[in-house]
Regions:
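Amphipathic alpha-helical and helix-coil boundary elements used as assembly
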Residues: 1-351
């Protein structure tokens, strides 16, 4: 969730993609985090030829290269309501897509806008007396841009069929000898980043074992591709131009943890009751472990007032000059729920 929210791509990479023999030990895989296209590496051969695949060929090649297009929103608009401004707060307005969706009409006239209403991470006091951070547009602007970049990524990609064996997801290559690209495109437009790979490999088994396997596949109603019968191996790639910004899919409503009601222990600065003028308390969530919080002086697992920000306490009745408060005491267990299912907005419902 955090990597999606911060536009960080991730992939599992091989430390050594090719082993010289079956006796060579396999090295550990690497988790790569990439937040900029410039950090994607080129494959070792760098260039791949668009050509037929044949046993007589010296090098593997790409045999089919087809553009895939889909209609996406031409503009992204994000907004949210903030109490301290008493208005609907917008980002920098609708962000128009940089992708050209029509040869006859511009993006503005198409009016395919996608609008989002985002729940804020906090609701501040109208008088600004609760120490809450002032609302701003920076987060909305970032989300607006990220959603727009993802829609542009989905607008056009390419499907390639190849016999290239040493090709890896998260690497880029230059496609050569493609008639359309050679005629009408610059060298930068011939560089493609691999986002997805499906592959087919044929086992090199003795004939009797192969016949038994084929019978088992038939009995299991599994189907093998007729196009692959004459090939020992093949793969299908999803690629985009290297110049297109790559961001992970992020849906603010879907890609977030499910927040359930849970318990927490009341923490204080040493007093029996520790609240601010708003009746808010501080708590330690029961799932926290000391080892996980040593990097920040133990905050979160110290059993004192450094364990959380101020947390609102629900009361039976409240207002200016009337109402009632029942203040939780040190080390008592309270029940925590979350506004709008947002883990950043906890509140105490009772004890």
């Amino acid at each position: 969730r955090l990597m999606r929210e911060e536009s960080i791509n991730w992939l599992i990479d091989e430390a050594s993609y090719i082993v010289s023999s079956n006796k060579q030990s396999i090295e550990a895989q690497k988790l790569r985090l990439v937040d900029d296209n410039a950090q994607f590496k080129a494959i070792e051969r760098r260039s791949i030829r668009y050509h037929r695949s044949n046993a007589t060929e010296q090098y593997d090649s790409i045999t089919s290269f087809i553009a895939q297009r889909s209609l996406q929103p031409t503009a992204i608009h994000v907004q949210r309501w903030q109490a301290d401004s008493l208005s609907q707060e917008d980002a920098s307005g609708p962000v128009l897509s940089s992708h050209k969706h029509s040869a006859n009409r511009d993006n503005e006239s198409l009016s395919l806008e996608q609008a989002w209403s985002i729940s804020p991470a906090w609701i501040s006091d109208l008088k600004g007396e609760d120490q809450a951070t002032k609302s701003g547009n920076s987060q909305l602007d970032k989300l607006n841009t990220q959603l727009n970049q993802y829609q542009a990524l989905q607008s056009k990609y390419f499907t390639a069929h190849s016999s290239v064996r040493d090709i890896q997801v998260g690497y880029w290559f230059q496609l050569s000898d493609h008639p359309e690209l050679e005629k009408n495109h610059s060298s930068d437009d011939k560089e493609f980043l691999i986002l997805n790979k499906h592959y087919y490999n044929q086992n090199n088994l003795p004939k009797d074992l192969k016949d038994q396997l084929e019978k088992l596949l038939t009995l299991s109603h599994w189907e093998t591709s007729k196009d692959s019968e004459q090939e020992r191996q093949a793969n299908e790639l999803m690629v985009v131009r290297r110049s297109i910004t790559v961001v992970p899919e992020y849906d603010p409503l879907q890609h977030r943890p499910v927040a359930h009601v849970q318990r927490a222990k009341v923490t204080t600065d040493g007093e029996e009751i520790h609240v601010d003028e708003w009746g808010r308390i501080k708590v330690r969530f029961l799932f926290t472990r000391t080892d996980d919080h040593s990097h920040d002086g133990g905050a979160g697992s110290n059993d004192n007032d450094t364990d959380s920000a101020w947390v609102d306490v629900l009361t039976p009745w409240a207002g200016e000059g009337y109402g009632a408060r029942f203040l939780p005491r040190k080390d008592e267990l309270v029940v925590i729920d979350f506004f709008d299912g947002n883990i950043d907005r906890p509140f105490v419902t009772g004890r």
